[in-house]
């Protein structure tokens, strides 16, 4: 996407400084909006859609209705039932109207700061200004991580951004689902120092049933990385009881990792950090009754992986 000046723009929902995740050292993480998968356990649901989205924090809301009076579209209504207030807060937002809004007048009207927007169109210059201000912390193996959503859904913007990072010798980590055309990946491979990709479910039919899409293109792109630079890949599998945690699935993923010569797999135990984010988006969390796997189960799955000669790290 380009603005009136012909500058590339992308929808960014967060830029985190001083991060110690998804790459070595201290990093600046840039989070892009838009994802092709719809994993029911998603911890960042605000990353899925490509448009700005309203976030409502019910604990900050006092029910003053200033937001309703400011909204020109009538998207905000009061909740009066005490039980409903306890569950979702003082106000209801018609998300079909909120998603189309471009003025967000409710934000400036809310002095309690109960409202915010996930998603802002930014130019490459905008993002680089935020990256450059952290440059001093990149000296000790730190760098820039592009994440999402999926940054590879913004290939023109991403290529320019990573080229700029490369010119300044910032090391770059890419966190991507790789569910994108292979040409999108190939365009940025010269600038990537580390890859972090989930391989959630090895069976393509089951993958489509759970996430909404087949994993054919994901596996194709992983094989490409395996052919060119396998040592740069950290393959990850979230361990979601009832979805990804079967011995058969983990064995299949580990076999694939070994085939691609990926040296390391990370397995990540299920958590419920996404529940609050779903509440703020006004969406329903799909796995309220799923519990994290036991330590014994995690170590059992790690043993299956390491039997294939792939180092396993439990995160």
From Swiss-Prot:
Cofactor (UniProt): [4Fe-4S] cluster
Binding-site residues, S-adenosyl-L-methionine: 149, 198-200, 271
GO MF annotation terms: 4 iron, 4 sulfur cluster binding; metal ion binding; oxidoreductase activity
Record-annotated 4Fe-4S ferredoxin-type domain positions: 52-81, 89-120
Signal peptide segment: none
InterPro entries named among the record's database cross-references: 4Fe4S_Fe-S-bd (IPR017896), 4Fe4S_Fe_S_CS (IPR017900), Aldolase_TIM (IPR013785), BssD/PflA/YjjW (IPR040074), Ind_deCO2_activ (IPR054981), Organic_radical-activating (IPR034457), Organic_radical_activase (IPR012839), Radical_activat_CS (IPR001989)
Catalytic activity entry: glycyl-[protein] + reduced [flavodoxin] + S-adenosyl-L-methionine = glycin-2-yl radical-[protein] + semiquinone [flavodoxin] + 5'-deoxyadenosine + L-methionine + H(+)
Nucleus is among the record's keywords: no
Pfam family, one: Radical_SAM
Residues that bind [4Fe-4S] cluster 2: 61, 64, 67, 110
Enzyme Commission identifier(s): 1.97.1.-
Radical SAM core domain span: 21-311
Family: Belongs to the organic radical-activating enzymes family.
Annotated function: Catalyzes activation of the indoleacetate decarboxylase OsIAD under anaerobic conditions by generation of an organic free radical on a glycine residue, via a homolytic cleavage of S-adenosyl-L-methionine (SAM).
Name of the protein in its database record: Indoleacetate decarboxylase activating enzyme
Organism: Tractidigestivibacter scatoligenes (Olsenella scatoligenes)
């Amino acid at each position: 996407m380009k603005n009136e000046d012909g500058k590339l723009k992308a929808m960014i929902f967060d830029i985190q400084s001083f991060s110690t995740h998804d790459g070595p050292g201290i990093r600046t993480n840039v989070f892009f909006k838009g994802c092709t998968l719809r994993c029911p356990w998603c911890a960042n649901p605000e990353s899925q859609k490509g448009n700005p989205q309203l976030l409502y924090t019910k604990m900050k809301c006092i029910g003053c209705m200033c937001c309703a009076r400011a909204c020109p579209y009538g998207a905000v209504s009061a909740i009066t039932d005490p039980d409903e207030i306890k569950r979702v807060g003082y106000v209801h937002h018609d998300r079909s109207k909120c998603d189309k809004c471009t003025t967000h007048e409710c934000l400036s009207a809310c002095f309690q700061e109960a409202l915010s927007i996930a998603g802002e169109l930014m130019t490459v210059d905008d993002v680089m200004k935020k990256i450059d201000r952290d440059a001093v912390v990149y000296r000790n193996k730190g760098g820039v991580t592009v994440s999402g959503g999926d940054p590879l859904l913004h290939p023109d913007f991403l290529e320019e951004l990573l080229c700029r990072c490369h010119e300044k010798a910032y090391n770059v980590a890419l966190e991507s689902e790789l569910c994108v055309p292979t040409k999108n990946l190939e365009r940025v491979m010269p600038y990537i120092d580390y890859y972090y990709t989930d391989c959630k479910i090895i069976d393509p039919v089951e993958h489509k049933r759970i996430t909404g899409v087949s994993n054919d293109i994901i596996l194709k792109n992983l094989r490409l990385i395996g052919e060119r630079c396998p040592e740069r890949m950290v393959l990850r599998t979230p361990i979601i009881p009832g979805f990804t945690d079967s011995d058969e699935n983990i064995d299949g993923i580990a076999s694939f990792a070994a085939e691609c010569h990926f040296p390391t797999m990370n397995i990540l135990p299920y958590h419920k950090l996404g529940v609050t984010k779903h509440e703020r988006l006004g969406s329903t969390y799909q796995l309220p009754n799923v519990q994290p796997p036991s330590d014994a189960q995690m170590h059992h799955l790690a043993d299956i992986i390491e039997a294939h000669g792939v180092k396993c790290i439990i995160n």
